[in-house]
Amino acid sequence: GLRQVVDKYLVQDRSGGGVYESPQFMYIMIALTIFAEYPKEVRMNYVKKYYDAVSKHKINIPTPIMGGVRTPIRQFASCVLVDIDDTLDSIFSSDMAIGRYVAQRAGIGINAGRIRGINSKIRGGEVQHTGVVPFLKKFEATVRCCTQNGIRGGSATVHFPIWHQEIRDIIVLKNNKGTEDNRVRKLDYSIQLSALFYQRFIDNEKITLFSPHDVPNLFDSFGSPEFDELYRTYEADESIPKTTIGAQELILELLKERAETGRIY
């Protein structure tokens, strides 16, 4: 345990091997940094309480805080959610944000469910969309290019709704089948479901898949009372492109990939 603390968390010269602090210095510096802006009359009381709690292992703190909060990086967030819109400006600026936060030791959540599906129209059909996989490969490369100052490799979980047009391709991205062209194995994935889809699974009904840009506000209404009504409205609208799949078929595919890879949430 002590060796792990020294190797992963203590401030040091990772090229030359010099270690500049002990574990107790690490704990007190974390406490001093976190409460540095508190009023003087209460600050040291909080510092002492926090130092006692972490140094006696009564509470645990995440790697980004333990490794970086007392350094010039000042990374206070252990995890960061990057919310991506369906535009190139948003996608590319989000990729830059992912890189910066990975370099600052944060774990990354990528909310990519607004990105439209493959072959969707862009500018009225002037261009066809390449789909989510090429952008996921870009995010994967960004996450893996930083090692979080030698403490650990970057990591990210990408979130998609189960009704996304490309969901069947998304849930297999981590498995060992396929080729490098159609797999993005270094990212993890989270699939968003609700009671509506679970009930359709129980009743052996269909799930309708959409490209997010064809169904305005559907993604943003997830988790609200309006979602179910809006989803059914779009299902009934014959002018909206859509495909259907058996709920049991899709969810069992998801569970199969989860069992085999262990990294679909």
What annotation goes with each model-predicted range?
Residues 1-265:
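Extended catalytic cores of very large enzyme megasubunits
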